[in-house]
Every structure is written in structure tokens, then in C-alpha cells.
Amino acid sequence: MVPSRRGGDKHAAERTKVDKKSYEYLVKSGIAGGIAGCAAKTVVGPLDRVKILFQTQNPQFAKYTGSWTGFPTAVRDIWLQAGVQGLFKGHSATLLRIFPYAGIKFLAYEQIRARVIHSKAQETAGRRFVSGSLAGMVSVFFTYPLEVIRVRLAFETRAGETSNLSSIIRKIYSETAAPTSHNPTNAITATASSAVEKLTPQAGLSNFFRGFTPTLLGMVPYAGASFLAHDTMSDVMRWPVLAPYTVLPNTSRDETNTTSQKPPQLRYWAELSTGGIAGFVSQTVSYPLEVIRRRMQVGGVVGDGHRLGIAEVAKRIYVERGWRGYFVGLTIGYVKVVPMVATSFFVYERGKYYLGI
């Protein structure tokens, strides 16, 4: 229960003003975001593992896709093979990545939003979407290699495997892509193709950025829709007709660098509901690009090692499974993302409140 701000509470008085441009706000919002991300990912760790195995068409689990019983069967197989540790394989890399990722994302959103939206009149859907998209892109720039490592840890399923964080990093770094297959029709084309291959990195650090472009493209609709849906539903929950049931009293405070007032905190069920809806919307609009990204990220352990571009991966998925291939694992995605995003926004909002920002 959130404490009342009435009376002579000295700490409450100190927290009635919020300056989003202060160094303290930057640090605290980053910490709140990082903790929120870790909490959310821990809640859905097993779901995330199975979803990655489905999306990347892992040979051992591809047979379970497209069936309502596929998910529980996959969980059972992982449990029997490796126990709880198997369900959370790659989770250490997840937490290593998610703390800075979520911290940067929420911090960036607050700062970008404060500069894009200066007053209530500018509180439009377009500005909210742009703020969320830019925040998501910023976070991806700084944390993408950790995401590749996490996916590779989660992808491995062979019995007896003891791959850890350091061994996976070495594997990814040392992988050499197979030469690109091409059939040039003339000498000029052949020379150009050969030159491009020689100039294109075939191993090393570039391996940690497989799938970076679709990730960046996918972050535009995902983060944009997520923050837009959350903020919009938060407004709905605070409508006068709903406020008596959804809002905690005496929890609003002013912002020093704007003319607006920071809205009061929502009750736990209302905050979880807004986050869940945000997760559903964002997952739906961005899922095809997420599938393409996963397939690119595991390129070094499936197929012939040939490094594929977005268009080629998209084409292969369509040839293999048709348009449904772009939505493999979406049901698990919903089951995973709704509680994950709900937990993330809930912990973040509560974290900000208790940190006094």
C-alpha cells in the first residue's frame, strides 16, 4: 500500500517536485528501469527459452510448433533433460543484458518524452509513439551484442552441453561465415562480388551484430506501440468515472521543468492491466521482424553458416512455412509478453515512486 502524502511528512514534501533534467533523476530512473526489466524477464524466463527454440526452428523442437500442446510438451522435454536449470538456460546472459537495456530504454523515454512533449496540448499519440520508438532504438544500440549471446545460450539443447557465457562468446567470435553463393553473369560483376566479400568481415566482432538491422527496424513499432499503448491506457484508467477505483489517492506531484502535474499512481491491478495491454499490442505489430531477427542471430549454428540478409531470411521462412512462418511461437509470445510488460511497467512505476522521482 502506498503511504499517504497528507500531514507533515517531511520526505513527502521533498518529493512534491520532480525535475526530470537533474542528474539524480537520470540515475534513479535508470536504476528503476533496470530492476523492472530484470523482474519482468525472471517472471517469464522459461517461456522465453521455449519461444526462442520455436522461433529459430531448433531441430529438436520444430516438431512442436503450430500445436496448442507444443508449449507444455517442450517444457516437459526440457525439464526431463536438464531440470529447472534447462528452463532458465541463458538467463544469466539475459539479466546481464536486460539491466542496462531496460535502464537505458526507460531513462531515454523519460528524457526524449520531456523534450518532445512540453505540455498537455502536445500529448498526442504521434509524439508518444516517436518518443517510445527512439528510446527503444537507443537501448538497442548499446546492448545488442548481449542479446545475441543470450539467444545463442537459449538455442543450445543437445544433451550434455555445458556451454557457459564465456564459451558462447568465444564460439560466436570465432565463427567464420561461408562464402556468399552467387553466379555472376560477367567479369565486372564477378570482380565486384569478390571485392565485397573480401571487404566484408567474415568473423570476429561483426558476429555479435547478426540480426541488428531487423532488430532496429522491429524496435520502432515494438517500443513505440508499447509506450503509446501504456500511456494511453494509463489515461483511460485515470478518467474521472474510473479514478475512484483505479487511482491511489494523494500520490500526484508537480514537475519543475514543465507546467504539468505528474499523475497519481494507479492501483496494482490497474497498472498491471495497462502494461499487459501494451505488451499485447506491441507484440502483435512487431512479431514478424522478431522472427527474422532470431533466425539471423543463430545463423552460425544452423544451415551452412552462410550469413543471410533480411530479405533472404524472410524468403526462406516463407518458402519453409508460408506466411504463418512469420508468426511461429506467437501464442507463446502473447503468454510471455503480456505478463512481462505488465511486470516491467508496474515495477518501474512503483520503483520511481519509492525512489522519489
Regions found by a protein language model. Name each.
Residues 1-357:
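Matrix-facing interhelical linker segments
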